[in-house]
Regions:
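His/Asp/Glu-rich metal-coordinating catalytic cores
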Residues: 1, 5-171
Length: 174
């Protein structure tokens, strides 16, 4: 929805890791294109039913223009947003570019530290970086969709992957 809020007038800075920016550049263009195709299909159907047409939430031009607002940051380096707010990104090890975002907010002589994290990766992964410790915080906002799940040992996961590759390549000739 970043291009959508841009299309509605947002012109603020968007802070993210370099990998997140690179992924966004591709994905936002792609979603704008897919959305345009879906809207064309939907509108043809609505025309036949003599019902109102719809417009895409945003287009490829919005997706391209919003990229000018992106500011990349390095992991583990504090960045001052303004006099009262500092932000730091810490590698969460979940996927390329993922981060725990820590805010330090000073207001009326008080300092509060707030951290937000989505998914957190596994320790000692062979594919992704190990999650790094983030600065202490007063408040933690944590996405926890799969928080009650235990993951298989990495060796078990590798054996499962090997089994799928073996079955696909050797037995199904894929």
């Amino acid at each position: 929805l970043i291009p959508y809020i841009y299309s509605r007038g947002f012109r603020g800075k968007i802070y993210c890791t370099a990998a997140s920016r690179d992924l966004c550049e591709l994905m936002l263009q792609d979603t704008a294109f897919i959305q345009a195709q879906d809207v064309r299909w939907y509108n043809k159907k609505m025309d036949r039913l003599r019902k109102p047409r719809i417009k895409p939430l945003y287009d490829t031009n919005h997706a391209q223009q919003v990229m000018k607002l992106f500011r990349t940051v390095e992991y583990a380096k504090p960045y001052r947003i303004d006099e009262e707010i500092e932000v730091q990104f810490t590698n969460s090890g979940h996927m390329l570019g993922s981060a725990v975002i820590s805010l330090t907010i000073k207001e009326n002589g008080n300092t509060k530290r707030i951290a937000y994290t989505g998914d957190v990766g596994r320790l000692h992964s062979h594919i992704l970086s190990t999650p790094q410790a983030f600065p202490p915080c007063d408040y933690l906002i944590c996405e926890s969709t799969y928080g009650n799940r235990l993951h298989d040992d990495e060796l078990v996961s590798e054996e499962q992957l090997l089994g799928v590759v073996e079955e696909t390549c050797m037995y199904k000739k894929g």
